[in-house]
Amino acid sequence: LLFQTKGNLKNPLKKVYSGKVAMLANGPSMKNVLPRLTTDEFKNTDFIVLNFFGSMDIFTQIRPKHFCMADPMFFQENHNHDRVMKLFDDLNKKVDWEMNLYIPASLKRQFLAFSGLHNSHIHIVPLNLTVYTGYEEFRHYFYRHGLSMPSVVTVALMAIYVGINSGYSEIDLYGVDHTFFDSLTVNSKNQLCICDTHFYDKNKVELKPMLRWDSTVWRMSDYLEEKMAVFKNHDIMAAYAVSQGVR
C-alpha cells in the first residue's frame, strides 16, 4: 500500500469541521429538497455538492464549503465537453467564498490544465484514491490517515469519505437515489439503454444508449459489476462511519 501511494503520505483532510453536513447528490429526489435548502431546516448545516451542482442557481445561495469531482469527464475531453466547460466557467466567476474542491490526487496536474480554474477562493484538495481490500481494522486506519479510501465508483462515496474525515458528526444524504435499474433495457441495436434522470433535468429524459466517458456503450456485465461495487462500498463506508462515531 505504501508503494501504491507513490510516496504521498500526507493526509489532506483535517478534522477542522463539526456538527452536521448535508451531501447533495444528483438523484431526482433532490427536486423536493432544493426549495428547503435556504430555510431554517438547514440553517446550521454545511454542504457538500457534486458534479454539475455548481451550475445551479441555488449554488451561490447555499455557498457550500465542499465540492467533489471524480468522473473522468471533468479531467479530459469527452462527449459532455461543452457542459463541463460551462461548469468550470461558473466556478471561476461565481465562487466568492472559501470552498474546498476535492479531486483524485493522481489527476491534479491534468485537472488544473483541463479545467482552467484560477479562482483563488477555490482550494484544490487532492485525495489518495488507493484502494485497500484487506482486514477492516487496517482499512479504517488507512482511511483515517488518508492512505486509502473506498473505490470511487460513484462520487457520492468520495463525498461521504470527505464528510467523515473532515470531523462532522452527522452526514445527511440527499439525492442518493441510486435508481440504476429502474428503466434499464436494450434497444433494437442491442445497446444497453436507460433513462438517466437527475434533479436538474429541465426536459423530458429520453431513453438512450448508456455511454462511458469515452463514448463507448456500456456492456450489461460491466454495468452490473460496477453497480455491485457501488453498494459494496456503501457498506464499507457505513462501517467506517460507525467506527468514527459518525451517523
Language-model-derived ranges and their functions:
Residues 1-247:
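Metal-ion/cofactor- or nucleotide/acyl-coenzyme-handling active-site neighborhoods
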